[in-house]
C-alpha cells in the first residue's frame, strides 16, 4: 500500500491549504475582535497588543520579530517539517495583519458588546489553532513553546501547555490595561485552552470497528484497496448457532467508517458491525508514539 508521488503531492498541497485557511480564520479573530478590545489571551498576538499599547511599534512588526525567534526554536526542538509549515503560517499571518492595518484600519471595537466580541476573539483563533495542530503545524509564537513543553514533559493535553505558556502574558495585561480587560483576558485564556482541547479531540476521533461476517474477502479488499487501511481477521464461531464466521478488526476515521458501512449495506453482506469511538490511535497511517 505504497503512497504514490501524486498522492504525496496532493497531501502536501491539502495540508498547506488547510494551514492557509486556518491562519486566515485566526487573523480575522485577532485583528477584528481581539486587538480592538485589548484582549490578551497570551501568545505573540497578546504580546503584540501589549507592545502596541505601550510603544509606537505596530502589532505586525512585533509579531514578525518574535515569531522569527520562536520559529528557530521550533526548528531545533520540533523538527524541519514543523518549522517549515509553521514558517509559512507565520508569513501568511504577518502579511494578512499588515494588509488589514493598511486597508481596514480600526479605531475601536466593532461593537459595544464586549462579551460578543470575546466570543469571536476566542472561538476563531481557538478553532484555527486546533486545525493547525491537527496537521502538524502552528501559528508560531508561544504555540511553539507550548508544543515543546508538551513534547519534553509529561503533559498530555495541548490546551494545558498553552495555558501555562500564555498565563504570564495575561498577568502582564493586569498592569497595562484596566482590571475589567484583564479579567476578560483571563476568562478568555481558560476558555481558549478548553476549546482547543475539545476541537482536537473531535478531530482525532476515530472508529475502532469489529465486524462479524461470513465472507471476509469483499470487506478486507474494500478496506485495503479503497480506504488504504489495514485490517486483521480471525476465524470465530457464533455462540448460539455454533456456525463458523470471520471476525475483522480495523480502525478508520469517521468518514472512512461511514464509507465502509455504506459498502456493506450496498453489497448486502451478511455482517454484524460494532463501532467504538477512540481518540488515541498509534501506528501506520495514524499518530506516532
Protein language model regions, located:
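Core subunits and conserved enzymes of cellular information-processing
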Residues: 2-214
